Amino acid sequence: MAAANPWDPASAPNGAGLVLGHFIASGMVNQKNLEIELLKLEKDTADVVHPFFLAQKCHTLQSMNNHLEAVLKEKRSLRQRLLKPMCQENLPIEAVYHRYMVHLLELAVTFIERLETHLETIRNIPHLAANLKKMNQALAKMDILVTETEELAENILKWRKQQNEVSSCIPKILAEESYLYKHDIIMPPLPFTSKVHVQTINAK
């Protein structure tokens, strides 16, 4: 039995191949189940992500785009011919419908302006699931940031309230200290000393 060529990329097993081989060996997955799942997936997404259908749609849109561009190049002359039909040069459209053709040209211009946006939307369809996942992650992070911001705002309000209380107490404390200093009143070092002790010291 010939050894596998180490320089051949096809001979080197990848992670997906090893996992799939393990599932097949354990009996959890077999060839028929894989084929059925692939056929179901291909059937569900054939008209959206299959290259054949995408190529057909892009080709049709490109053909329409080329046709409308060619029409727009003659927009001025077409408008004049529709509004003022001349002998042997007017389009084979009844005169009562000429104004509708002018409106149709305006719609065509609008469609061509938005064509690139529509094509970009079609190209992004295969990446829609990944984009939705990223959007959900961004929304979750935004919710966390909103919660943290609310908590920070509450803390700021509490801190401001405490600062206001401290600021309102400072003049009262200064007035008491000034009064005590003016009358030579010595406050006891212990906070729970009775007023009688203070009066005794003052009497001395």
From Swiss-Prot:
Residues 54-84 form a coiled coil. Keywords: Cell cycle, Cell division, Coiled coil, Cytoplasm, Cytoskeleton, Microtubule, Mitosis. One of its GO terms (biological process) is microtubule nucleation. InterPro entries: HAUS2, HAUS2_metazoa. Belongs to the HAUS2 family. Component of the HAUS augmin-like complex. The complex interacts with the gamma-tubulin ring complex and this interaction is required for spindle assembly. Interacts with EML3 (phosphorylated form). This is HAUS augmin-like complex subunit 2. It comes from Pongo abelii. The lineage of its organism: Eukaryota, Metazoa, Chordata, Craniata, Vertebrata.
